[in-house]
């Protein structure tokens, strides 16, 4: 039996003010063929999973907190206990709009890394409305900071 214990997974911090801890896949001791899963903590007041897309379909489950979810041309507020289905290749973004951390579980399939992790760390994330489709009207701005930027 293989067990991944969240308290023993350091995870990775991203410029958009979030911590991602892989529970299945990545640095986790658990690896699956058909899906990857992890825990994400978005810092209060703007922590974000920036506007991106990927080949895999995905689910975000909000464990606690309040966020603005953008999916394609749609924008909605999501909160504790809600799940969002993200179809393959559709651009999406989740921003913490609350004053407390937002925690969510992601699950996507098939398993594997997704390009936006590396792009964000390299500062090469496609920018909304330039290299990527625009965000929905009135959405929180996409974070495209590079590691070390203090902006």
Segments the model singles out, each with a brief description of its role:
Residues 1-35, 50, 118-151:
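A short, N-terminal "cap"/entry segment at the start of jelly-roll beta-barrel domains
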Residues 19, 55-56, 74, 90-91, ...:
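A generic "binding-loop/recognition-motif" signal
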Residues 21, 69-71, 104:
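Short hydrophobic/aromatic-rich beta-strand segments that constitute the beta-sheet cores
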Residues 40, 59, 85, 100-115:
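A short hydrophobic beta-strand segment most commonly corresponding to one strand
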Residues 46, 59, 66-68, 75, ...:
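Structural motif
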Residues 73-88:
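Short acidic-glycine-tyrosine-enriched beta hairpin
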């Amino acid at each position: 039996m293989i067990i991944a214990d969240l308290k023993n997974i350091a995870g990775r911090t991203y410029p958009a003010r979030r911590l991602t801890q892989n529970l299945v896949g990545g640095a986790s001791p658990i690896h699956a063929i058909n899906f990857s899963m992890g825990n994400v903590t978005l810092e209060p007041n703007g922590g974000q999973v920036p506007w991106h897309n990927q080949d895999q379909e995905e689910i975000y489950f909000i464990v606690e907190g309040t966020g603005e979810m953008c999916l394609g041309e749609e924008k909605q507020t999501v909160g504790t206990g809600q799940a969002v289905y993200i179809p393959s290749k559709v651009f999406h973004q989740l921003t913490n709009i609350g004053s407390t951390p937002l925690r969510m579980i992601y699950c996507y399939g098939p398993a594997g890394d997704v390009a936006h992790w590396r792009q964000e760390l390299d500062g090469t994330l496609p920018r909304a409305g330039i290299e990527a489709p625009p965000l929905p009207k009135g959405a929180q701005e996409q974070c495209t900071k590079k590691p070390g930027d203090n902006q």
